Amino acid sequence: MCIRDRVQSEQGILGGIYGGKKSNFLKCKKFLNSFCKSVFNFGDVSKASSAKLLSNFLSLMTTTTVIEFFKSAKKLNIDIKLLCDVARLGSGNSGALDRIADKAIKGNYKGYVFSVDNTYKDLNYINDLVSDLPNANKLSKMAKSFYKQASIKGFGNLLVSELIDKEKY
């Protein structure tokens, strides 16, 4: 499994997650290194799958927060460039902010290349994975409800960062 998308694959900077027999790891790693910056062995397939979903959980929750950060700043008429500059100096700095901010400040909301429907699908899997962890389950359900509503409103094919430009979903 790989982390990120086709563009990063072509650049050879993906993160690879391996799950399977230890004896096959080196063979697979050699192949994965042709398009991955790093490859991580999580042991068996189920742990690798869970690791991928947990990685997506962190990414999607952070991305959802960045989207709502932009929407809130717009609604409150706060200079988003200045606010992003402040966020980047503290704990609010993140890969999601970096992928979205510079383009969104200029009115291009295609910075996070992952669709609303794919996000909703992943959050369903994540919600199942963390079903016995009360707080993680609540967080994933909350985010899942955002993307479910966006999909119902016809935004399923949009990139998640394009939701910044939608008033309500």
What are these regions (language model features)?
Residues 46-162, 166-169:
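Helical "substrate-binding/catalytic lid" subdomain
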Residues 4-56:
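Rossmann-fold dinucleotide-binding core
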